[in-house]
Amino acid sequence: MEESSRVLIVGGTGYIGRRIVKASIALGHPTFILFRKEVVSDVEKVEMLLSFKKNGAKLLEASFDDHESLVDAVKQVDVVISAVAGNHMRHHILQQLKLVEAIKEAGNIKRFVPSEFGMDPGLMEHAMAPGNIVFIDKIKVREAIEAASIPHTYISANIFAGYLVGGLAQLGRVMPPSEKVILYGDGNVKAVWVDEDDVGIYTIKAIDDPHTLNKTMYIRPPLNILSQKEVVEKWEKLSGKSLNKINISVEDFLAGMEGQSYGEQIGISHFYQMFYRGDLYNFEIGPNGVEASQLYPEVKYTTVDSYMERYL
């Protein structure tokens, strides 16, 4: 029996990174977690690292500013997965260029998964500013990966359930509203809602799979392809409470960007892409893409219905 690939996870204490670490350990991969020396002053992250260590992970100290430490870490594994923070923290995405250089020098990596996990940046040339900067930076990382001929898989995980299912896609809210809910336009634009733990499982499933080599893997669980209105209706049925629905036009929604912080403007522009334009599901997967739930039907993914039960 072929041995499982050794996996290095960069950003393993982050929101999605911790799920990938958990999945890697659960699926039997020798798991390594890169951590920066600055982390030792953060008690919560240290506790998380020690918990992973207790479960079998190996901790490797390295820094984006220390090329040799990165190369040394990369040489110990077969696969590198980056889950560094994106969003308005754009410098973290571009720091992956240093990781690409280390992987290129090490020369032993069989697969690299860069930090994407949201909308496919390769399809977002039209994206609105300032939210487009996230996609621009991710494309720069892709270009570096491909120029270095590094075997890779890009992952488009769509909407993280923890951020938007509970809050019914209300900006700045992650728990269900009790009285009213804003619907974007008519609320009927289809989106894809994915449990973060499932993102971790699908990611680890993909790293040794030849079907995902040098392709984009889209995570589209069929039962979770739902409009915002459908998600709201599911919550109303589950909770037994009706909400006052307020439709907001695209013009009024975008007018709300004025006077907001840079980070909030990025969030608003991403909501526009998802819930007005429908950029999560307004395209067919092409020959350079694959779909996770079709590749791995054995994964019992979490449906939106069952995810919502935790909020009762």
Curated annotation (Swiss-Prot):
UniProt source species: Thuja plicata
Subunit structure: Dimer.
Active site residues of this protein: 138
GO biological process, one term: (+)-lariciresinol biosynthetic process
Binding site for substrate: 270
The family this protein is said to belong to: Belongs to the NmrA-type oxidoreductase family. Isoflavone reductase subfamily.
Encoding gene, per UniProt annotation: PLR_Tp2
Enzyme Commission identifier(s): 1.23.1.2, 1.23.1.1, 1.23.1.3
UniProt-listed InterPro entries: NAD(P)-bd_dom_sf, NmrA-like, NmrA-type/Isoflavone_red_sf, PCBER-like
Pfam families for the chain: NmrA
Catalysis: reaction(s): (+)-lariciresinol + NADP(+) = (+)-pinoresinol + NADPH + H(+); (-)-secoisolariciresinol + NADP(+) = (+)-lariciresinol + NADPH + H(+); (-)-lariciresinol + NADP(+) = (-)-pinoresinol + NADPH + H(+)
Misc note: Leu-164, Gly-267 and Phe-271 are involved in enantiospecific binding of (+)-pinoresinol while in PLR_Tp1, a 'Val-267' and a symmetric substitution between Phe and Leu favor binding of the (-)-antipode of pinoresinol.
Enzymatic class: oxidoreductase
Keyword NADP: yes
GO MF annotations in UniProt: lariciresinol reductase activity; pinoresinol reductase activity
Keywords (A to Z) from UniProt: NADP, Oxidoreductase
Role noted for this protein: Reductase involved in lignan biosynthesis. Catalyzes the enantioselective sequential conversion of (+)-pinoresinol into (+)-lariciresinol and of (+)-lariciresinol into (-)-secoisolariciresinol. Can also convert with a lower efficiency (-)-pinoresinol into (-)-lariciresinol, but not (-)-lariciresinol into (+)-secoisolariciresinol. Abstracts the 4R-hydride from the NADPH cofactor during catalysis.
Cysteine pairs bridged by disulfides in the record: none
Protein name: Bifunctional pinoresinol-lariciresinol reductase 2
UniProt binding sites for NADP(+): 11-17, 36, 45, 142
Keyword Methyltransferase part of the UniProt annotation: no
